[in-house]
Amino acid sequence: MSKNTSDLSSHTPMMQQYWRLKNQHPDQLMFYRMGDFYEIFYEDAKKAAKLLDITLTARGQSAGQAIPMCGIPYHAAEGYLAKLVKLGESVVICEQVGDPATSKGPVERQVVRIITPGTVSDEALLDERRDNLIAAVLGDERLFGLAVLDITSGNFSVLEIKGWENLLAELERINPVELLIPDDWPQGLPAEKRRGVRRRAPWDFERDSAHKSLCQQFSTQDLKGFGCETLTLAIGAAGCLLSYAKETQRTALPHLRSLRHERLDDTVVLDGASRRNLELDTNLAGGRDNTLQSVVDRCQTAMGSRLLTRWLNRPLRDLKVLEARQSSITCLLDGYRFERLQPQLKEIGDIERILARIGLRNARPRDLARLRDALAALPELQEAMTELEATHLNQLAATTSTYPELAALLAKAIIDNPPAVIRDGGVLKTGYDAELDELQSLSENAGQFLIDLEAREKARTGLANLKVGYNRIHGYFIELPSKQAEQAPADYIRRQTLKGAERFITPELKEFEDKALSAKSRALAREKMLYDALLETLISHLPPLQDTAGALAELDVLSNLAERALNLDLNCPRFVSEPCMRITQGRHPVVEQVLTTPFVANDLSLDDNTRMLVITGPNMGGKSTYMRQTALIVLLAHIGSFVPAASCELSLVDRIFTRIGSSDDLAGGRSTFMVEMSETANILHNATERSLVLMDEVGRGTSTFDGLSLAWAAAERLAHLRAYTLFATHYFELTVLPESEPLVANVHLNATEHNERIVFLHHVLPGPASQSYGLAVAQLAGVPSAVITRAREHLSRLETTSLPHEVAPQAPGKPSVPQQSDMFASLPHPVLDDLAKLDLDDMTPRRALEMLYTLKTRI
């Protein structure tokens, strides 16, 4: 199809209508309603057929060309939409809004909804345990305004961020499925490397119009009440988001009631690398198994799980909030009160998203049935909440209201097990509306009328093979075999000829058809009108209902954390004002669940006298586990949770950094070592004396001297910054750091060898490791025994011939390269001698190349 569709005169009327709508949405797939199917045309059809693995065919011709087409049944659209959304596609839903019986030309069609990955609300298209976020960003390299919206809950927030680095870290945290940026931004910016980036017109971000639309949405004169009146960039981004949401939903958004101003200074910041390394809610393979959330999430509701995920990804530095959560968990543990609450919370379900769909006016009948059941369960839950003494739990109880009138209305209106959609009726109870009952009675009694009519006609005509039936195309009919058609009475009017049969209509049957079909269509229309009125009633109660949902989600998280504290042997950490991090018998919460043997717990102590631990020991000895468990304990403490330790005393931290493991960034053109150095640079630039830093094997991706020098200098820098640092290394030379840096101490993970086999003991002990056990680990990994034997020979020779291991402490501030055993010092090569004698200044390029080839042959 030609890309130029501005001249539609050569197209058929149907295709003219299609292109008028399609030209408004050139970059989105259009589902075009044709009877019982959504049909997809032209380039959209080719793309959809490939993505959905459905047949590509053709639908006649228009403008002299065949029309590529594929289609799906309208009643099965959800599954196909879910697949497209997961693939990052956006879909325009175009429905028939006119009456085919009265339409002249093509039936009128309109775009009723645009489904994009960030604005879907249908239950079938969403992951119930994860937020589905869309974000918009505005600004320059110095300052950015970021707005974030979850249309499935109504959560709407803004913040302003300094610099690309912090912006990208925040985007990594929230992980939006769509990101809106101004169309006048240059191409190739860092944010565009993310999935789902969509460019919007610059005027969509204009501050004054954004401010006006936000005030209209929230029915306020200004945004001062939300604390964001002066956030010019963030307001522009929020205005763009609101406009996009309205454009895609094609309806009012009453469930968007407020704007929350978030501040990075209130949180513990984790960059993208740290978030990935700690495997908070996604493991390194992209799954959810063996993540922190997989261990600490036993929430009874999906909305509780989503809130817990937010907490894990946004630890707080607000001591008042953290201590309120701790007190709540303690209260819920007292007398095992959480055990009474959790079954009741399970009855509540995911009312947060149900209420959002009600606000969007696309709630399904089963949504209302679930809301009915939740409202019925509220009084008993509220009664249980009143028995809780903790101040914060009392506040949640006060926010949780009961709604007896709404509960009674829904109980009266919705049948016990309603169908999935309102379209075919059968949702509202008999007795809810007298007029609907009358219409349904007339329609439903049609079957008995047809049975009686068939019996009467058989008796009247004497034709035993006579049948009375109905189909959607031709309506009601009397059918006779072709051989008996000539015996039909005179009042039988021929309606349809089939192979082997004739169909007729009689005046009596025609009169009934008019009444029955009219009654059915009027009943469906009446039921849809009553259902919409029910939604409007619920929408008028949205604000308190949403507040209740928010309170119950938090109660679910706190009850869950109490249950986890009991069953995982977690204890309450204590925040103190003096700088310290003291953990007794700390454990890795994920690893200990996977092990079939008891986990070896370890202590940690950092304070003003010791700010860095240099950790040595064998591979697989537990260094990385020890470091990660420290970070996870600190993180859990900063969401208000109890922690996997016998005791924990710590001061608030501002950031958690990890430099653990690396892989190539092939798409970005960065090697493993480059990735490692980028992460190290980020830490050295941004760590403070309140940061927790984990550094594992820094410098291993380059030559020995380069790597050692970089690791040494990085460790010195962190010691001078006074950051809480765990520095794991195989460079034994670094164990002399405490001699020049008084805030540094050595610890090691112990192991022992028995019959040339290594046994890892996993205990963290003071002082440096005595040896590395590298060959024993290689043997354990299955390296061939011949290779191990040969390696032992090389090791013995190198240990004998190398220079003694000796490093002189260097005064701070003086440039130095740490000295190390030069394992090749006793192995001179004649090529090196010849190379040193060459006079490169007097050598022509050709001669240099010839010499290079000659030297190469001698290596």
Swiss-Prot record:
Protein family per UniProt: Belongs to the DNA mismatch repair MutS family.
Biological processes annotated in GO: mismatch repair
Superkingdom of the source species: Bacteria
Lineage, top ranks: Bacteria, Pseudomonadati, Pseudomonadota, Gammaproteobacteria, Pseudomonadales
One cellular-component annotation, GO: cytosol
Chain positions recorded as ATP binding sites: 617-624
Pfam families: MutS_I, MutS_II, MutS_III, MutS_IV, MutS_V
Keyword Nucleotide-binding among UniProt keywords: yes
DNA damage in keyword set: yes
Chain segments carrying region Disordered: 801-820
Gene3D superfamilies: 1.10.1420.10, 6.10.140.430, DNA repair protein MutS, domain I, MutS, connector domain, P-loop containing nucleotide triphosphate hydrolases
Function field: This protein is involved in the repair of mismatches in DNA. It is possible that it carries out the mismatch recognition step. This protein has a weak ATPase activity.
MF terms (GO), sorted A to Z: ATP binding; ATP-dependent DNA damage sensor activity; damaged DNA binding; mismatched DNA binding
Residues in coiled coil: none
The protein's name: DNA mismatch repair protein MutS
Keywords attached to this entry: ATP-binding, DNA damage, DNA repair, DNA-binding, Nucleotide-binding
